[in-house]
Amino acid sequence: MGTAGKGAWVVPAPAYREVEGWEGAGDDSPGFRCGHSLTVVAPTKGHGPRLILFGGATAIEAGASSGMPGIRLAGVTNSVHSYDVDTRRWTRLHPAGEPPSPRAAHAAAAVGTMVVFQGGIGPAGHSTDDLYVLDLTNDKFKWHRVVVQGAGPGPRYGHCMDLVAQRYLVTVSGNDGKRVLSDAWALDTAQKPYRWQKLNPDGDRPSARMYATASARTDGMLLLCGGRDASGMPLSDAYGLLMHTSGQWEWTLAPGVSPSPRYQHAAVFVGARLHVTGGVLRGGRAIEGEGAIAVLDTAAGVWLDRNGIVTSRTLKSSHDHDASSDLLRRCRHAAASVGTQIYIYGGLRGDILLDDFLVADNAPIQSEFTSSMYDRVPRAENQNRNHNFNSDSPTTNNSTDKKSIDMLTQASAAEAEAVSAVWRAAQEASHASSEDSLSEGIGSESPLSETSPMPEDLDDGGSLEPDVKLHSRAVVVSKEAVGDLGCLVRQLSLDQFENESRRMHPSSNDQSYPAKKALNRQRSPQGLHKKVISFLLKPRNWRAPAERAFFLDSYEVGELCYAAEQIFMQEPTVLQLKAPIKVFGDLHGQFGDLMRLFDEYGYPSTAGDITYIDYLFLGDYVDRGQHSLETITLLLALKIEYPENVHLIRGNHEAADINALFGFRLECIERMGESDGIWAWTRFNQLFNYLPLAAMIEKKIICMHGGIGRSINTIEQIEKLERPITMDVGSIILMDLLWSDPTENDSVEGLRPNARGPGLVTFGPDRVTEFCKRNRLQLIIRAHECVMDGFERFAHGQLITLFSATNYCGTANNAGAILVVGRGLVIVPKLIHPLPPPVNSPESSPERAMDATWMQELNIQRPPTPTRGRPQSASDRNSLAYI
């Protein structure tokens, strides 16, 4: 963990306000409540993200011994209420199955579209330590009790629990009725039979406490904050719990000075910022003033209140309160975050039970400060291709327990795999029925929105002469002989590209890397981007470094990301660009290919061609290849140097829950060290949330990473997506934009299920024609899929797929290509072929051996699939084979 240097970019804690316009009358509204839980569940097919409120007390009474109000156990409930973030409506749920007993002061954690509950206290005393699962999948609500073998944490209340590293349910501290506890337990949701494991972490262990909070950061660190010790003293410390690659857990004391000690507070992560609200001091006195709202910025290593960085624990007097601080003068409330918004419900203020509903928005546009540290890293609440449920199964204990175990495993795997973030729908038990159920939800007709009518004055377009034309010949750099860097350049007729329809997809199984994370910081001198360009932009002379250590430290990565982020924040979601321009497809960390393309066809420098042609990159800068760090840092540096000429949009791998699995996080750790590497990886992913999502060239060509899918009918739909944006708040439009693909060929029309996973689609040529006609476009350029010749035409030439990395995953043997769009909108493909393997080349053998090892290890984890048209093995059908 580090501390922030001077001038660190931090944003004060946000202001809270009451949620406006929410609905929920009568029994649907949770009403007065304290000691409850509030948990965010991933979107389902029929709903967007939802908040699940469970349990808690509906009445209070004066404490006999303390004179302070406490919960009335007779008023404790087990009711379940759901708040739909999109519709702003509260609904009381009545799930099938045997519910847990009424309880308060329990612990809850989300696993995909399920919520796990454990412990608590109610009218019957301490609740058991059984795990109860509320399954919301497929919008069929049902309770399940999960069977766990062996000893566990035991009955307790006032403890905390969260899902760590998208895999481990970790519960910490609490009170078992006899003593205050300091232990930590973990349950691996990917291993059956389920067993609790008592952890023995290294490092600075936190003292025994209850009424603390524990929140998991997206990259897998659990942050324990505050609490009350055995003597009743409130605590002000915070500890990070993380698991190293060896499997050993470690506690680390968080830096900084917290605004106040506290317990019975609420805390939730938004990106790298832990938002802490409310709580009480010794004797139950509510925290007042600025201390009622706090943020621990784990990236900058500082605590903040409403005024900025906290340097000493001096609470303001009551006349300094702002309205937001007064609202948060409460305890026993609950909080959850959706995107950049933090929601709070209920609680206790003195002897007054609350039923209000609050929200704060951490979006940078609403802040008068600029910060690089606070936008949200996407939650790994994404979807599992193997995630199959049968909600109509018999309710006998044996079958329920078995199915609930399977469901919990599959849900946690869904988090770890993180592929279909918005559209994980529950499938039937078999792979075949999974495909069938998806097919039933996707018809062959294109679901064009009735609210987006075609322009009345637009005719069929058959009589119009198109302005955009694909040149009849492509420029090709032939395969290079060893030692021959001259490169034979030739032109081929497009008719000679026999492999043009051979699209290919990388694959994987459902394994995931162990969690590795830390707290850290950043900052660096001015002009850093020039250093990066000078060091990396060597099109003819670049060689992979013999030493794997990266030449920038996390301090400099933070500076680079901040400078680029300020530019991206000022750009529209859909860029408006002019020709001439070069368009690049997926690079996937293959920095050598980027240098070859620059060398052969010009590079962005005043010594190159930047003075008369722009550059557009279509995303997927990281993962798979061995030099993702070089690729993304150079592109960011070029963006800073030439902000009006170099353009970057987002790909599906520019998301933490994807690039945690496919090499980028591992590369950061291996080349920068674990602490600096995880911090840098997190910082890059924060920046990715600001990237533009599409680009228009001369208002006639639209460029995107994935496609139009089933939901995108107008460019305005893309323009309305507000950044920073994460997969879980972007919904179907963002998912289609980054993930959808064309169908197999022009003969397959409409929509079809996409082999990449549940909820993802392929779109036919009819969709392309309708979209272009509706938006007065002549061409779609997209990336996302490996194609044998580096580019591929679809929909009678109205769509081109572009891929710039050669020999993808070290096995594809595909060419890489760029498209050069001239002033007359004539498009010329320019290709490079894969380099042949070296023949006893001592100079290149060590680095190529490293390349081979890197590819082999990653391909074992995520094996590439056969080329387009070859049969797919049954074992791969529900894997990550297609990311």
Swiss-Prot record:
Enzyme Commission numbers on file: 3.1.3.16
Q: Enumerate the cofactors the protein uses.
A: Mn(2+)
What does the entry list as the binding residues for Mn(2+) 1?
586, 588, 620
Keyword list (alphabetical) reads: Hydrolase, Kelch repeat, Manganese, Metal-binding, Nucleus, Protein phosphatase, Repeat
Q: Where is the composition biased (Polar residues)?
A: 385-399, 872-883
Name the PANTHER family for this protein. Answer: SERINE/THREONINE-PROTEIN PHOSPHATASE BSL3 (PTHR46422), SERINE_THREONINE-PROTEIN PHOSPHATASE BSL1 (PTHR46422:SF6)
The answer on whether this UniProt entry bears the keyword Hydrolase reads: yes
Identify the taxonomic lineage of the organism of origin: Eukaryota, Viridiplantae, Streptophyta, Embryophyta, Tracheophyta
User: Which molecular function GO terms apply here?
Assistant: metal ion binding; protein serine/threonine phosphatase activity
Q: Answer whether the UniProt record assigns the keyword Repeat to this protein.
A: yes
Q: Specify where it is mainly localized.
A: nucleus
Localisation per UniProt entry: Nucleus
Cofactor annotation remark: Binds 2 manganese ions per subunit.
Q: Where are the Kelch repeats?
A: 64-113, 221-271, 273-323, 341-387
**Positions of the catalytic residues:** 653 (proton donor)
Q: Which InterPro entries match?
A: Calcineurin-like_PHP_ApaH, Kelch-typ_b-propeller, Kelch_1, Metallo-depent_PP-like, MPP_BSL_C, Ser/Thr-sp_prot-phosphatase, Ser/Thr_prot_Pase_BSU1
Q: Which Pfam families match?
A: Kelch_1, Kelch_KLHDC2_KLHL20_DRC7, Metallophos
The identity of this protein, by name, is Serine/threonine-protein phosphatase BSL1 homolog
Q: Which family does it belong to?
A: Belongs to the PPP phosphatase family. BSU subfamily.
Region Disordered: what ranges? 381-402, 430-466, 499-525, 861-883
Tell me a GO cellular component.
nucleus
* Reaction catalyzed: O-phospho-L-seryl-[protein] + H2O = L-seryl-[protein] + phosphate; O-phospho-L-threonyl-[protein] + H2O = L-threonyl-[protein] + phosphate
